[in-house]
């Protein structure tokens, strides 16, 4: 079971680095708007704030442009574009802008609609006869508008994309085979491949290519002569940045290879400079006009920047743009994240104000800081009053626990509440009245926290967290209003089974200590179905006593090999080698989780591998009663196991997958079933892992062999380039 857990965690770790979320727009303390004569001091404050944040987040370099009233009022490079040689960033340094590309693709669509070449309510099949979806009703009704507003019903299907082995038509076909996670138009689900389909449909409608249309219809008329859609062109320029990631645990900056995504180019392939991107912002702020020439109709701009679907709370999505309010002002924005680069484009139409921030590090939160700082300094923050009196913040202080066992801390700092999430920066909580708060800078947009009494238990408190990917309830476990708890290692309820008794029954259920210890190694052959991705995998998962583990997987789509992954852990150190992503070395919490989870004798050694074991409460999994056991290691992340009261086998596991470089912790749930006795040991032949990023991943064991002679080098980094 532990080997399957590592397989699923590995793929989720990759997904973390590709996750794109809207950026926060944050309220600030009252501050008057800057006047034209005050720009110098306001711009100096902006630069100071962002330089401090850049250094804090380990960002080698960035370039910022600010546009106000159709004029560039700030344009500067900060830091370095080449970390190794310390070459400075300039205003003309090219960076990858990632998903900020989507607004350009949407612009091409509305331009084409202006010309009558297509309608936003056309079916993509009109231009792409091969386009289809697994849901036949959705396939019959889906429109270009649905593709451009992330409401196709599909979860992210990025796995096939990142391998780089499929062309655009193949990627679209793979997405069409993926199992949907919602009905058409039911909810917002970020979808890169649907944007690739939209861009390809526009190209077919115009009898051209997406790259040519971007150059002809947008770059050329805007004078964006320092922009491109291909890495090869970027690298031929005289001034471009390398891309990097930064490990917050080891403080190491690493150069990354640039990711070419020609097949999904309409979703994120543009490279540009701050100077060029100023022209793009001017076009949007001038309602489709640049230097007196109209490039797109006012109706087209309205389509781009009006609500097409709600994401969560006040956060909406247009066509290629996130939409919301900031102190009564409409804000239109979109971030971008791709290997080694992160971007933020944002503008405030009624203030004729916008900016572009380009950085050379993966998955940075600095865009949120830029937005809040620039709005505060140049627009000003009027005094505001909450819709209802704020409750006493002191009573909200304490620890809150996610279903996956991750603890969130709420504390007071300068008489204001702060939410701290493991592995992330602290988020100030801004009161919206009563016990409702907005998560401040640098939280992603659309995150809100409401403290409330537990239903039918008014004396206890819970935290209701609203987020774009789905809401979650966290139970308060310490502080006023917390459910009473006991010392670690005991039961949370005296009527529950003790930890020692539970472990004894589990050991017996899995085959007994003698049977478990008689084996010294195992090799499992597995088939994996990424149901919501349209991708499959086959491979082996190997383990050897006392705590060595390895995995070798081959991924396929449309019957074609698209990639490989090897993971390895020798008992002390390890990592991952992939054909489609940079090599990863385990560190920080990720390494600690691997250490705790790789013990060959698993449940026999839980007491040694985890600092605390606590039977928290009773629960149900699929109608079956379970004990919920929390496992906490010294430095890793907590795990919740749901153990059948009948069979004493683990039916479900809640945990988190950590990426030290992407700076995320992604909750996942795994369900274990089809237990079979293999040479005296119970093995779950089916595992279903679920996360917001990957959807359902179904793993089936096809063969188990015990006590195979596995050489030491199987648990070391591969010596060849087989997996590159």
Predicted regions and their residues:
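Gly/Pro-enriched, hydrophobic low-complexity segments
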Residues: 441, 558, 622-718
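A short, polar/charged loop-to-alpha-helix boundary motif
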Residues: 81-90, 365-373, 660-669
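Catalytic loop of the DD-peptidase/beta-lactamase superfamily, centered on the K-T-G motif
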Residues: 28-75, 159-162, 203-216, 238, ...
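N-terminal mature ectodomain segment of secretory-pathway/periplasmic proteins
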Residues: 207, 501-504, 508-582, 608-617
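Flexible, processing/modification-adjacent segments and terminal tails
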Residues: 385-391, 490-502, 507-508, 568-637, ...
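Active-site helix/loop module of the DD-peptidase/beta-lactamase fold
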Residues: 61, 91, 96-100, 112-155, ...
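Short, charged, amphipathic alpha-helices and their helix-cap/turn boundaries
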Residues: 42, 46, 161-183, 208-225, ...
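N-terminal leader/targeting segments and the immediately adjacent pre-domain N-terminus
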Residues: 2-10, 14-89, 95, 111-119, ...
